[in-house]
Amino acid sequence: MSLTAKDKTLVKTFWGKVKGKADAMGAEALGRMLVVYPQTKTYFAHWSDQSPGSEPVKHGKKTIMGAVGDAVGKIDNLLGGLSALSEVHATKLAIDPGNFKLLSHCLLVTFAVNYPTDFTAEVHVAVDKFLAAVSAALADKYR
């Protein structure tokens, strides 16, 4: 599934609204993922506290949302732009790529809850396609 020019514009515009609160959105989405999909906790076993709002979750949000913001900037070449990050996830972190979809879903829910006016159906579809493309790019080095 490829992103159209309109999709890219919608994603960039929406990210412009979100980026000022990206840390809060990341913490909420990561906390949500750890509660709704408890199997993902295995990747964060080194954290002393995995509960939503804990310091480790707050720290993890910066990594995740920084990567999302970076991906928005590389929206025209996600595969090439996220190649190094894909390599880290595949070889060093050994994260099951199915988990990218789980986090993407939690991000979508978080955006919908926090931006009910801005996160229209059209924006939702564009951001969903974008996150699916990011997930595919991150999974590329698993092959």
Curated annotation (Swiss-Prot):
Residues bearing PTM N-acetylserine: S2
Gene3D superfamilies recorded: Globins
Record family assignment: Belongs to the globin family.
A GO MF label: oxygen binding
Protein name: Hemoglobin cathodic subunit alpha
Stretches assigned to the Globin domain: 2-143
Residues that, per the record, bind O2: H59
Assembly notes: Heterotetramer of two alpha chains and two beta chains.
